Amino acid sequence: KNAPQWQKTGCNIINEQTTKLFLRDGMTNDLSLHYHIGIVDGLYDLKRLIQLNKLPDNLLSPELDNVLLKATKVVMHFTYPSYFIKGSKDCSPAFNDSWIKTRSVLNKNFVKYAKMFPDDSELDYMKTYGKGTPPDTKIKTFEYSGFYVLRNGWTPQSTMLVHSNNVSSKLEDSSHNQLDNGTFELYHNGRNFFPDSGVCSYMKENDTEVMELRRWFRQTKAHNTMVLGQLEEHEATGTEDINK
């Protein structure tokens, strides 16, 4: 008998947490594309559940659609041109504990994004593997999460560079964010020439070896990172000053 109140309470919590979870440029605040995609997928499922059960539309904040549209565009801009090659398995960067996404996995998500935003031509282009007008090739700046994307096209032969210059307060041992300012990946003509080292190990608080490994993985030298000079802090385990 209290179902409507539970629905309202649950959705109010989601509305509140969503504003905290996503940065103003659309990226989730732990800066991991892998978890970003999962969170967007969960919110898509929630919206579908509300629609299928014919629940009140105002359970979710009207601002949520704006947040989700930005979030879907993050995935779009982070997708390598290899996505347009049939059977491709390396279609996304591996920054901040991210598993590399395959063409088929990304397409399943773009299909959902296009359902949420059926009038968006860019998402339709991604859903259909390149039918219609491609997104533009301007430099894409994600100033709040610290990512910069440069590309000269959306065909498999294109060149694309993703540069990571993250600043995050979530740098404790459990964080997905690495201390890897200056890390980059460079794609050209069907190949990623500088794939990041990606995922190291899940956290185990009582396992000293695992925790030391995670801290070691935070070092600049564990990633494809551009540095100026050979500073001592580049070699210390997980102690780089990310604000430099």
Regions found by a protein language model. Name each.
Residues 2-22:
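Alpha-helical cores of eukaryotic small-GTPase signaling modules
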Residues 5-7, 17, 51, 157, ...:
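Residue-identity detector for glutamine
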Residues 6, 78, 99, 125, ...:
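A residue-identity detector for tryptophan
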Residues 23, 27-193:
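Carbohydrate-active enzyme catalytic cores, enriched for enzymes
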Residues 180-244:
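Active-site rim segments in enzyme catalytic domains, especially the processed small/beta chain
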